[in-house]
Amino acid sequence: MSFLTVPYKLPVSLSVGSCVIIKGTLIDSSINEPQLQVDFYTEMNEDSEIAFHLRVHLGRRVVMNSREFGIWMLEENLHYVPFEDGKPFDLRIYVCHNEYEVKVNGEYIYAFVHRIPPSYVKMIQVWRDVSLDSVLVNNGRR
């Protein structure tokens, strides 16, 4: 099986009913704790606003946020981390009317209320300590 190059960038068009599906494995990092980061950018560059930011700190927490006008907004933390080092994961981010619904391996973990409309998202980037099998956008709900 071939893996995707990390960081992985994907041009997208999101709307209510879209689902971002990310499959991969967190890989051990001897420098620090393994991490996974997913960013939904409003332009095709990393300096743009971030409508949704998800960062997994393995064994500690999951952080969700947005970046508006170059400033990080109020961080939302989840102290339940449903990812395991070296084990495959299936991360799904559903675009709902009012929020992004986040599921890991079929388990609902969080709803992040939209701060920037999902229709503004132009690019998704997935990176950090991860081996990626696939990243795709499904425009049907499930």
Curated annotation (Swiss-Prot):
Keywords: Apoptosis, Lectin. Residues 6-138 form the Galectin domain. Predominantly and highly expressed in the placenta where it is localized mainly in the syncytiotrophoblast and in the endothelia of fetal vessels. Also detected in the amnion and chorionic trophoblasts in fetal membranes. SUPFAM superfamilies: Concanavalin A-like lectins/glucanases. SMART domains: Gal-bind_lectin (SM00908), GLECT (SM00276). It comes from the Eukaryota. GO terms for molecular function: carbohydrate binding; lactose binding. One of its GO terms (biological process) is apoptotic process. Binds lactose with high affinity. Strong inducer of T-cell apoptosis. This is Galectin-16. It comes from Homo sapiens. The lineage of its organism: Eukaryota, Metazoa, Chordata, Craniata, Vertebrata.
